[in-house]
């Protein structure tokens, strides 16, 4: 079957949101997710779940949305002019986890499906998604584990899949105005419809499970690591980069805002607290400097 089964994708994404929320709730051991069901005037809606002030996670948001429209916003047609004049559906699950302990990295993942149709023409559809990790204090074993997990889930789909999507992730989650990466990357893919629907959908499912396999062991390793005000201040400073990326560069944020998405859900990815400091420059031999020197520059973690 090479025609997309939209209702099957929808059911999978709803179940995925349940699975991820259950896993994060168990990892936190304190707070629970609160749910908002919402409708979009132009068509569609979603289910937003947010956990706040837990034992481990300061904030975690897991959002499901399925939206419809008669015409695409500029953010979608800018690099795909053939989509102009088509109606569309977009659905996906997106999540961001902001831990309280600065030694636990922030993580982000999403999987999404998009289809654009018009009478008398074949539908144009694709999957996209991925996951990426944003440490504040880097640990070599965590970075290696994260990327080995990513490579392992890609391997059944071909030898070139991990290096291609790893490179794409490094390129995408990069703050051009700062000339620095947001984190240590992971996987990023878009416009995936080859070789067929079943294979592309299977890869999306593998990425979804791979995120939990990659992230939860890191949370478990670092959640009891002692920390103080110095680490907290650096975490808040680095969260500022997260805000900058999402508001300036992220295509998903722009699409959500330009397409009339629910603003509270679109901006759910924002950290609850962040700060900026003019011309911050960490001491050369400090753990903070090590993040910039040893972790943010793109590298091949599989060779470590």
From Swiss-Prot:
In which residues is substrate bound?
A: 94, 110-112, 260-262
EC top class named in words: oxidoreductase
Q: Tell me the protein's name.
A: Oxygen-dependent coproporphyrinogen-III oxidase
Q: In what pathway does it function?
A: Porphyrin-containing compound metabolism; protoporphyrin-IX biosynthesis; protoporphyrinogen-IX from coproporphyrinogen-III (O2 route): step 1/1
Q: NCBIfam families from the xrefs? A: PRK05330.1
What is the gene name? hemF
* Location, primary (coarse class): cytoplasm
Report the GO terms under cellular component: cytoplasm
Quote the subunit structure annotation.
Homodimer.
Q: Which cofactor does it need?
A: a divalent metal cation
